């Protein structure tokens, strides 16, 4: 599936949120939107539609999901009983690439997506190379045994980086085994901060 590979700094400045660590560093240095009239653009009042669109774009870029798949996730969330926006965020959090990132096996979601694509991740012992796969409570996500001898994964364990990593409460990390278990569904506070999911619901409900 295609991915956005453009300048993360410009996107972070336009949306007002760091979509990656690099984007956050750039945003901290220069918060105005990109372009000749960046400061004026920040002062300009957004329409309701503009605010809704911006929130959708934030979520898409933060989680690395393109429009077609994002809309599919929204439609899935809207068919559920309960709060649509919160369930949408739960679906985004439970993407396999995001879980690999949350467990600390990767430093960015883009890197996590690459690890999944290259077949380094197993779910319940089965190789799963689909980043958009939705994990379920009780499933075990781990680095494939054949991949653990690779320098990257050995360094994760030997350096103690994983031992210091704090996974969210809905995931239980076993650093020594390079694995993690989904022990609960993610709550609203477990999702990325700075997203107003109600505006996303309003965008698709127009």
Curated annotation (Swiss-Prot):
Keyword set includes Cell cycle: no
Pfam families per the UniProt record, alphabetical: Ribosomal_S4, S4
The organism's place on the tree of life at top rank: Bacteria
A cellular-component GO term for this protein: small ribosomal subunit
GO biological process: ribosomal small subunit biogenesis; translation
Keywords: Ribonucleoprotein, Ribosomal protein, RNA-binding, rRNA-binding
Domain S4 RNA-binding: 94-157
Xref: PROSITE patterns: RIBOSOMAL_S4, S4
GO molecular function ontology, one term from the record: rRNA binding
Family: Belongs to the universal ribosomal protein uS4 family.
UniProt function note: One of the primary rRNA binding proteins, it binds directly to 16S rRNA where it nucleates assembly of the body of the 30S subunit.
HAMAP family in UniProt: Ribosomal_uS4_B (MF_01306_B)
UniProt xrefs under PANTHER family: 30S 40S RIBOSOMAL PROTEIN, SMALL RIBOSOMAL SUBUNIT PROTEIN US4M
Subunit architecture: Part of the 30S ribosomal subunit. Contacts protein S5. The interaction surface between S4 and S5 is involved in control of translational fidelity.
Protein name: Small ribosomal subunit protein uS4
Species, as recorded: Chloroflexus aurantiacus (strain ATCC 29366 / DSM 635 / J-10-fl)
């Amino acid at each position: 599936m295609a991915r956005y590979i453009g300048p993360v700094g410009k996107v972070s400045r336009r949306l007002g949120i760091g979509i990656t660590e690099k984007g956050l560093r750039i945003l901290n240095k220069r918060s105005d939107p990109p372009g000749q009239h960046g400061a004026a653009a920040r002062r300009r009042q957004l329409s309701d539609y503009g605010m809704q669109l911006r929130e959708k774009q934030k979520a898409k870029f933060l989680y690395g999901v393109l429009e077609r798949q994002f809309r599919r996730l929204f439609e899935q969330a809207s068919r559920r009983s309960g709060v649509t926006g919160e369930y949408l965020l739960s679906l985004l959090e439970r993407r396999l690439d995001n879980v690999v990132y949350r467990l600390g096996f990767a430093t960015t979601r883009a890197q996590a997506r690459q690890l999944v694509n290259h077949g380094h991740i197993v779910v319940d012992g089965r190789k799963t190379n689909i980043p958009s796969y939705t994990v379920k409570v009780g499933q075990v996500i781990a680095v494939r045994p054949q991949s653990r001898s690779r320098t990257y994964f050995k360094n994760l364990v030997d350096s103690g980086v994983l031992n210091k990593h704090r996974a969210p409460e809905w995931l239980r990390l076993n650093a020594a085994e390079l694995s993690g278990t989904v022990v609960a569904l993610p709550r609203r506070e477990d999702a990325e901060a700075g997203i107003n999911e109600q505006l996303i619901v309003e965008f698709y409900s127009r």
